[in-house]
């Protein structure tokens, strides 16, 4: 396997899960300090799976037919990073938990499709997936772990900075995605409903 492609895909996986790990585990530590109840925090975690159910119907249908995967990945992460910045700004500005959770929902609508997309990008650019994919994918797990360590080391596990870290990393991954190997759409033609 080409060393440059391996490095690109490994970095993509690392950043993909760093974005998520930067806020997902420690969010209640901060949200509780700005007035979120246990129910509000429950909704913070419920909106992600709801987004995961909804987003493939739109992003998947369009991405698989009309756009290169790396371009969709870039757009999703850039938009998701901006939405996470907005959510953090709403937290800082004292917005209601419901409106903050709605903004997190919007950011997750852009994030969840990229989980499958990152695997697609990796699989389509690896000659021997059985041999090479595990060593690339494990960098995602390492990215998640390093995000947690970074929050602890920086003292951010109870601060709004975790959301800013996720936002900045998402935007960086969006920009980095533009350098990933070209991965054209797998299908062509009109989008149909059935």
Question: What positions do the PLM features span?
Answer:
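Hydrophobic core of transmembrane alpha-helices in multi-pass small-molecule transporters
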Residues: 14, 83, 95-117, 121
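Juxtamembrane intracellular "pre-TM" segments in multi-pass secondary transporters
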Residues: 1-4, 178-194
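Helix-to-loop junctions at the C-terminal end of transmembrane segments
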Residues: 54-68, 154-156
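Symmetry-related core transmembrane helices of the 12-TM Major Facilitator Superfamily/SLC fold
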Residues: 147, 162-179
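Structural signature of the two symmetry-related core transmembrane helices
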Residues: 71-86
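Helix-loop boundary and gating motifs at the non-cytosolic
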Residues: 1-52
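Loop-to-transmembrane helix entry
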Residues: 37-47, 131-136, 141, 160-164
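Residue-level signature of mid-helix packing/kink "hotspots" within the transmembrane helices
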Residues: 49-57, 144-145, 149
